[in-house]
């Protein structure tokens, strides 16, 4: 929506609930690229997206308003992660994006004792995802309609017609183009019946902070 709005396109966002909920509503997020140890098309896409996202974050959200350019330290918490990160570290073309660090170097970067080696992403960042989502949606060319559950999308002559329900009332919206961003929830739309959606459950945990957590100088 923001990319289209930046190009002068008037955008209407139909949000099933309130903006920046579900995965976008996580209290904390880390910006880095979880890439494979060997070059793939997905790796290229992820690295391009990582660089673009980092630049966009700089441009659209003041650092004091929900993010911190502190770097991300990806620790080798098991043998599989250690092998993968060692292979990544040997890819010299990406040495400016990340580098391998031993436990002592990791401890110096983090500001607390670390017993694992890892991969250091100096341009990585910690962020509060809802703050960024709401900043992007605040663009003057974007109209946000919350609690609007889309029930059907149909093509009518030279435009698309979206049927949605908001607070118990039925509404219809006409649009020249439609971008579906509902993830696995899009499967309920008749237009997408039969598409191979695969819901993947995510989970985050929270814990009380201690003295060491308050001394951290980077994201782990």
Go through each PLM region and give its residues.
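Dinucleotide-binding Rossmann-like beta1-alpha1 core, especially the glycine-rich loop
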Residues: 28-109
């Amino acid at each position: 929506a923001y990319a289209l709005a930046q190009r002068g396109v008037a955008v209407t966002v139909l949000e099933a609930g309130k903006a920046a909920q579900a995965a976008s509503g996580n209290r904390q997020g880390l910006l880095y690229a979880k890439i494979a140890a060997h070059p793939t098309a997905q790796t290229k896409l992820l690295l391009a997206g990582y660089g673009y996202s980092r630049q966009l974050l700089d441009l659209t959200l003041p650092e004091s308003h929900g993010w911190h350019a502190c770097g991300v330290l990806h620790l080798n918490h098991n043998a599989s992660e250690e092998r993968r990160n060692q292979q990544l570290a040997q890819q010299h073309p990406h040495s400016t994006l990340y580098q391998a660090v031993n436990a002592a170097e990791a401890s110096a970067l983090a500001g607390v004792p670390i017993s694992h080696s890892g991969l250091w992403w100096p341009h990585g960042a910690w962020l509060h995802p809802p703050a960024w989502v709401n900043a992007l949606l605040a663009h003057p060319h974007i109209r946000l309609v919350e609690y609007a559950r889309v029930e059907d999308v149909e093509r009518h002559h030279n435009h698309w017609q979206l049927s949605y329900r908001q607070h118990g009332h039925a509404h219809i919206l006409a649009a020249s183009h439609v971008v579906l961003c509902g993830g696995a929830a899009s499967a309920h739309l008749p237009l997408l019946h039969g598409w191979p959606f695969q819901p993947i459950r995510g989970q985050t945990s929270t814990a009380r902070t201690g003295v060491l957590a308050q001394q951290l100088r980077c994201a782990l």
